[in-house]
Amino acid sequence: MSLDELFTVRSTATANATQIRNLKAIQISIASPENIREWSYGEVKKPETINYRTFKPERDGLFCAKIFGPVKDYECNCGKYKRMKHRGIVCEKCGVEVIASKVRRERMGHIELAAPVAHIWFLKTLPSKIGTLLDMAMADLEKVLYFDSYIVLDPGSTNLTKMQVISEDQYLQVIEHINEESFVVGMGAEAIRGLLEELNLETLRNSLREESQSTKSQTKKKKLTKRLKVVEAFIESGNRPEWMIMEVIPVIPPELRPLVPLDGGRFATSDLNDLYRRVINRNNRLKRLMELGAPEIIIRNEKRMLQEAVDALFDNGRRGRAIAGTNGRPLKSLSDMIKGKQGRFRQNLLGKRVDYSGRSVIVVGPKLKLHQCGLPKKMALELFKPFIYSELEKRGHASTIKSAKKIVEREELVVWDILSDVVREYPILLNRAPTLHRLGIQAFEPLLVEGKAIQLHPLVCAAYNADFDGDQMAVHIPLSVEAQVECRVLMMSTNNILSPANGSPVIVPSQDIVLGLYYMTVERSFEKGEGMVFCAPWEVISAIDNNQVNIHAKIKVRMEDGNIYNTTAGRILVWEGLPKGLKFEYVNCVLTKKNIATLVGNAYRDAGIKATVILCDRLKDIGYEYATRAGITIGVKDLIIPATKKTIIDTATSEVDDIERQYRDGIITRTEKYNKVVDVWTKATQDISSEMTKEISTEVVKDPKTERTEVNQSFNPIFMMSNSGARGNQDQMRQLAGMRGLMAKPSGEIIETPITSNFREGLTVLQYFTSTHGARKGLADTALKTANSGYLTRRLVDVVQDVIVYKNDCGTVDGIEVKQVQDGGEIKQNLSERILGRVLLYPIYHPVTNEIIFPENTLIDEYVVKKLEEIGIASVTIRSALTCQSERGVCALCYGRDLARGHLVNIGETVGIIAAQSIGEPGTQLTMRTFHIGGTASREIERSNFEALHSGRIVLTRVKSVENRDGVHLVIGKSGQLSIVDEQGRERERYSLPNGARLYVKEGQEVTKGTFLAEWDPFNEPFVSEVNGFIKFTDLIDGKTYQEKLDEATHQSSMTIIEYRTTSFRPSISICDAEGQTKQRITSTTPAIYSLPAGAIIMVKDGQEVQAGDIIARKPRETSKTRDIVGGLPRVAELFEVRKPKDMAVVSEIAGIVTYAGESKGKRKLIVTPEIGDPKEYLIPKGKHINVSDGDFVEAGDLLTEGHPELHDILKTRGEKYLAAYLVDEIQEVYRFQGVGIDDKHIEVIVRQMLRKITVTNPGGTTFLVGEQVDKGDFKEENQKIVEEGLEPATAEPLVLGITQASLTTSSFISAASFQETTKVLTEASLKGKMDYLRGLKENVIVGRLIPAGTGYREYMELDIVVPEQKERPNKFLEELEERPVLIEIDS
């Protein structure tokens, strides 16, 4: 690995294959010149590589056999000594040691430089390490190192200072006036080396510490702290500063930079050879010039060229232009070898190509069992070759491997018999790229099939996200017994029924199967056999076989539990095919996709894994059979266009004409017009959609005997496909048979003119053109987003790769409180969904009897959830990864249930990686979502009222209101909230009331479901007068602060406030008494003055009398754009990366009363006044929408304007727990909007990693520095030590890091270097002499051993297995193996 040339990699065990397992840690540090000479087997003196006539390496050249070892095994260069018998002899003629040629991969050489050079990494990696240590600016340092300026080493009697950088001219001026002896200057790396050698680090450390404590300036403190960090790193690591300047350069082994002969007598060479040659040439020339005593200027130039050559070797292109090869391509330097996707880390250490693998196209295998896959015979023959050879020898068909090979090549009959024996019950792995989560690789038992395509079981397609339109999959063969056991026990498709992301079944029938099951379980009136009563299920089957009863007929059956059920014949057919032990209720319904998923989930919980697998296979078989028998197809006639479509469109068109007229007359603004038009069309589209659904979803059935009719659920094929969840949705049906509706522009704005036709009628050219606009954006997005999503996943994996379950219980006393998630009164996620699979922190008491129902540390399973719902618990405090006290990783109780297995998580589980995959995987799914709707604008009709969704009692919080002329209460301000609570006092729904809403209920009023609570104008924001009085205008100047518009039809004029340039005007309306004194508001102590923002329309005249509750002005609300995940994925990344949001909200840092204080510097000024303490003022930019009204009360952390708050602000004002909850909610919001379920705990694991560092505010007696970022665990440990010694402990404040930052500051430098910014990470690590204890997963993969998790968890690895002697007894296990599928359940 090419780190060696740059650093020593000192490992605490020799890197021998057996000892790699026992490796405890790896240390990296700067190589001293002595070290480099010690590694070297000789000095490379000549730039020659090989002799072009003899093809033998040149002596003392870059490929010299004397230094690096022989080219041929056990043969010296001149051919005097050959073969093993001379092993270890050094040939006296050519000086080559007789040894194996592989030493040419490990022996290093060196180059003795004629002049020292600076190591470019320590010079150019920002902040420059050499610069920081000498306290020099980067520019000055470069001038000195590249022989552009002098540096003063000893000022003597001059007025210059030591380490001052002077130009050639200044130097000559000084020399004229002064005797040269006492005055010393230097140039180049030599001078810098001298300065570094002189440094006394201990003294420097002490003086820096004192200075840092005494200084008041923050910038200076920062600078000193930075320098102090570097000084401390050198002292603690034992590295010397002068080692950053090199006298000797290591030469890496020749086999790692090979010279390969091509045909035609030319050679292909590694770029490193060119770079080394350049260094050697310049070095030799410099030596010669120095021996000849050449002029100073020539030597100086040569030294600069040597420095540049070494720079290019280490990091080409870091400084100046990159040195290019013969073809104009920049040469690949040592740094390029290790960094980036093609570098050593990511290309060869983290991702390797493996043998015993193959790939082919996949086709569906409808006859397979869930644990099987079809493997083409040709492929199997190639993959299992060694097994076949050995078996041929064993059975005596071949005596040598060579003859076995021939038999296999001839494909004799015996080969196929042996192949089928070898393959039987041998698990193989199937993988589909991109592998976005762990279900992208699963194990199956192969069945040999003819043809060349791999057959895949249809139910695992969802996990692989595979379809059969030409997808390919790769096959891998696990070789060792351990690998085979892991495949069977952990990776078998039958053991992966639940999704690790949310615990719901991932093996769920889809498409044809769903359609078949739906068709079987639908009922229809007046079918043959309706009303028959059967004594048992077998009787029904017999009746169906004898054609006495139709499968849709409504019948009654006595089931095994003795009850008589109303059901259909088809449902009994399904029931008969299922494994025993499941309740009949699970299938006694119309089996839509949702119901089937519930059935599979219930089966898993009730009957166990084996029964579920059998169930899934039976459902597949029944579903396919009946989908075929039903013969459901699509015809154009099935798309029924509603009769009322024309009327609805005509009504909408006339409404739009009205709105257009109002706009032309100036009654409404452009924004209002746009909003209203879009709203009209949205409503029309929804009306047509519901009309179409009504017509397509029901049909009238006639009894042939009695002529009686009944309305049934429709058997329209398109409706059945959509309703069952097999294919297609409401939106797509609407576009086919209703109207396509509004389309969106690429910017997300909605185009005002909708497409009124549907696909059955066909689109006009113009309509087609309108629809291409949004559709094209969908396609472009897909391409871009896939890459973005993959990058997000990579960052997530990197930040949590070392989060493993380390212990069972960390003993924490802290947790998080969880409630249901609501939005606009709707429950988006109820409490039971959020707490399922978590662990209780506190015991739960019965609200009435006060006895403990569930003790602390109870795992909340389905039973507990049901019980909690019954007794009506509204919020629960659970343990969480966020509050887990484990030093490394998390503990099992804080994590809770392993979602994919349904029991408490095992110790050693890689919960971090699972979390990253669960969040990253849907990202890619979501990216693909946009273009399926084909760019049609999905927009809700603007909401303009609240209706009660539950019965209960009204509770109003912070609601201020005034009564208007009609006796209706109008809400003032935006901080008011309305909730409905039930008898137990649990909150069932909660709404934020908008300013100016008409409130129809009172505090404490009992309401029933459906009661009208409040309504408002969705397009306008009203300004409501709070008192009776007379209007007085201030700063309303025509043409300057407002514009008058005349309405032609009504001859009424309206005044609209315009953007005014000067800040001296503050247009406002005040309400005065008869004497002209401004009156007080009712809701607060401030005067009744209303500032008018730009765009507000005034509804009153100056001097007019108004009453409380009158609307004196209104401001049209902003237009809404369509949301899709394209907004969503960047939003998720923005949150995880802790970036400043684009629409950043202003957050109040304190609690208090808000007052508007006019404007300053073109911004609006808000002042928040607390009860005690100083008020804080906030400047709000003009365009920003303010969320609070004058006189509102705000809490610390409340948003004063619209938009998203910055995460650092939340951390400062509300603390860590609130920030964590906010992050979880915001990220879930994005995924929930797309209908993707991810368990909270996955996001919590990632947020835990973002919050794992803290910033030191006061170091106390510790060695920390002010502003240093420290790991919480290390901080705690250090403080405990300090307290024991009786010194003052350090204090710190919480810190939130973005995932990239968190990955780069991880304790493992190997992991960080393989992530991003490789050179920077390695430079800083080597400077500190860092140790990597190999605790994470990536470090272990890189050093080539098993990951310390799962079966490779260290504590499991160290267990001794003792097998007690047993008496012979019949082996039940083997008998059971005969019944397939083989399933081994492992208990936690």
Swiss-Prot record:
Cofactor(s), names only, from the UniProt record: Mg(2+); Zn(2+)
PANTHER family listed in its UniProt record: DNA-DIRECTED RNA POLYMERASE (PTHR19376), DNA-DIRECTED RNA POLYMERASE SUBUNIT BETA (PTHR19376:SF54)
Gene of this entry: rpoC
Protein name (Swiss-Prot/TrEMBL): DNA-directed RNA polymerase subunit beta'
Sequence positions that bind Zn(2+) 1: C76, C78, C91, C94
Functional summary from the UniProt entry: DNA-dependent RNA polymerase catalyzes the transcription of DNA into RNA using the four ribonucleoside triphosphates as substrates.
NCBIfam families per record: rpoC_TIGR (TIGR02386)
Keyword Nucleotidyltransferase appears in the UniProt entry: yes
InterPro entries, per the entry: DNA-dir_RpoC_beta_prime, DNA-dir_RpoC_beta_prime_bact, RNA_pol_asu, RNA_pol_N, RNA_pol_Rpb1_1, RNA_pol_Rpb1_3, RNA_pol_Rpb1_3_sf, RNA_pol_Rpb1_4
Species whose genome carries this gene: Lawsonia intracellularis (strain PHE/MN1-00)
Keywords tagged on the record: DNA-directed RNA polymerase, Magnesium, Metal-binding, Nucleotidyltransferase, Transcription, Transferase, Zinc
Coiled-coil residues: none
Keyword hit for Transcription: yes
Swiss-Prot/TrEMBL catalytic activity: RNA(n) + a ribonucleoside 5'-triphosphate = RNA(n+1) + diphosphate
EC number: 2.7.7.6
Residues the entry annotates as binding Mg(2+): D467, D469, D471
Single Gene Ontology BP annotation: DNA-templated transcription
Pfam families assigned: RNA_pol_Rpb1_1, RNA_pol_Rpb1_2, RNA_pol_Rpb1_3, RNA_pol_Rpb1_4, RNA_pol_Rpb1_5
Family recorded in the similarity comment: Belongs to the RNA polymerase beta' chain family.
CDD domains: RNAP_beta'_C, RNAP_beta'_N
HAMAP family, alphabetized: RNApol_bact_RpoC
